[in-house]
Amino acid sequence: MSNIQNMSLEDIMGERFGRYSKYIIQERALPDIRDGLKPVQRRILYSMNKDGNTFEKGYRKSAKSVGNIMGNFHPHGDASIYDAMVRMSQDWKNREILVEMHGNNGSMDGDPPAAMRYTEARLSEIAGYLLQDIEKNTVSFAWNFDDTEKEPTVLPAAFPNLLVNGSSGISAGYATDIPPHNLSEVIDAVVYMIDHPKASLEKLMEFLPGPDFPTGGIIQGADEIKKAYETGKGRVVVRSRTEIEELKGGKQQIIVTEIPYEVNKAVLVKKIDDVRVNNKVPGIVEVRDESDRTGLRIAIELKKEADSQTILNYLLKYTDLQVNYNFNMVAIDHFTPRQVGLQKILSSYISHRKDIIIERSKFDKAKAEKRLHIVEGLIRVLSILDEIIALIRSSDNKADAKENLKVSYDFSEEQAEAIVTLQLYRLTNTDIVTLQNEENDLRDLITTLSAIIGDEATMYNVMKRELREVKKKFANPRLSELQAESQIIEIDTASLIAEEETFVSVTRGGYLKRTSPRSFNASSLEEVGKRDDDELIFVKQAKTTEHLLLFTTLGNVIYRPIHELTDLRWKDIGEHLSQTISNFATEEEILYADIVTSFDQGLYVAVTQNGFIKRFDRKELSPWRTYKSKSTKYVKLKDDKDRVVTLSPVIMEDLLLVTKNGYALRFSSQEVPIQGLKSAGVKGINLKNDDSLASAFAVTSNSFFVLTQRGSLKRMAVDDIPQTSRANRGLLVLRELKTKPHRVFLAGGVQSDASAEQFDLFTDIPEEETNQQMLEVISKTGQTYEIALETLSLSERTSNGSFISDTISDQEVLVARTR
């Protein structure tokens, strides 16, 4: 019981998780800066080498290797070991593969490898150079997980594997992404740094200008590469290698022969084909994966008139034909994860190789000295051969003979052992010469090794020679092309859109769609698909290259390119704005819709219930970044109850504002200033406390009408409302009643020509040709009335007009609109 300690759970959890984090950082996901290997990779290579599963021998079942690795060094499950082994065999993920594998080891399409019982593996030839001299006490060893066997903590690494094959992994609080590089270039940089320990980054980059991905491609951004080599972090653009191929009949196709590193080819082909299926860019006929054993090839066949460069730019921008590669060069350096630059990686590798060469030389020197000692004894024996033979013959046994040799002739234990085990044929004159030559060779070797151990310059010459030997044997050309500047992809979106005629429809409730002329002409206007409680407010023929602007009662504007509208039948309801616009409110309604060809010029005027008015420029409505998911403001409302009453393009005429209490004010539209989208505007009319604006319209005719909520209608002359200035109260156009007073429901201009453009949100709906402007009124009981406005007689300003029916006063007006 004395060993039991009381500790808080908080302290225990923190301390234990700290241990766990340290373990997975050092022992799982991050590579060592010296050999560039994670522990599982190192264990795989060491175990296969220890078992003799090397490149000069036959392949061995992967399952056997995995079992040995798991049983002796890595008790974390066979899947993780096999996955790591397979990855080291994939030539599209490693610049130099470390494991050779027979059988299905996966593919660039993301296909899984065959089970380990079906595949065979062995170390590659270059992997042997990572393990070279490991038997010569060159690296430290540690006990394995069950203290039954020792394993190396690092490999000798005769080439800089961390840079050559790169690394990627995620640990607790750390992640690493080190790109692969060309073996020749890396070795050239190491050799230069050996000769120039304080070499500048710029000079090193003359030898190692950038990554070299096994999948090739084009790497753009020299400044970012330099930043990454300096700080350990950076980002470059990796672009596919493409070419435009001419076909018969004037057609073209885009051929992709190299894709960015770590991009799944099958997913890439699917994404490109999705662009074709969804017609995001017109002109693509077919997408084919024509890859075979000779290499990668993706063919994107185009229509005859398609703009191949524009389509290619679109695919580069919106698919993984072009990606960003983010450098995050983190490695374990002296048991600590560090973000390292190129100079640190190279200097750490050189320091590691220095230790390896010195320890190897010490081992070889000790071995040579031991052998020299034996050879010296054997040569001495040959000079007194008869005496030695006589002594051995007179001895009782081997041990007695050894003791007699040591006592009588002062031989050492090792020399005595060699003498008594000497075979008789070795006593020929030929063997004497051989021993003398061996003695000379051993003395020369010891001198050389002593120089390596004692003289740093000699040691570095050995290091450079060995690196150059690796380069000579395994060098291959660079696969990735380097370009200094990242090219900005510019897409002429207009050229991507096929120009087609279509009909656009919008309802007050926010449903919109586009319909082909064929579907539109096959139906009548009344057959439009809509909800029973909704109202069609806009139908217009347009082109798919044009733009739709929707202005709402809450002061928001929604932008939609017409080609992005859902193409539906005329009888379909359409897509509701709430499906895409996240800030579209439940009570929000569409007030006005407009189709524009460009945003170069044009003004709009907006009038709110609170009597404020503003003009704003169409240029400010050019597409914003988040237009697909959010609307933007075109006017700021004064309070939550305020609403926009009227919005329309500005014409150079007077404006006439009519309030619910019957006040009318007329002033020039030029009095209204042009303001930004976020402003609330200026006061258009001076309202009483209990009043609000009912209607606003441009004066384009000699008369206008006023409809009250009780169904009373009158027509009066515009001149009865003289032009004045904005922000005044205006004149009454209704006579005040003590009981059941009239309130303005709708007011607007009376046109002599029904096709004339009117400052009213309903005029865009196409109707059958008529010479009369009609007012449609629907009562709260559902009764519909139609009145030809031009047939109304002019009334006095102070009159309340006439009821449109005998019963309308009791029913009251629900909806009113002109057409």
Swiss-Prot record:
SMART domains: TOP4c (SM00434). It holds the Pfam family DNA_topoisoIV. The record marks 117 as: Transition state stabilizer. Its EC number is 5.6.2.2. Its main location: membrane. PANTHER family: DNA GYRASE/TOPOISOMERASE SUBUNIT A, DNA TOPOISOMERASE 4 SUBUNIT A. Topoisomerase IV is essential for chromosome segregation. It relaxes supercoiled DNA. Performs the decatenation events required during the replication of a circular DNA molecule. This is DNA topoisomerase 4 subunit A. It comes from Streptococcus pyogenes serotype M6 (strain ATCC BAA-946 / MGAS10394). The lineage of its organism: Bacteria, Bacillati, Bacillota, Bacilli, Lactobacillales.
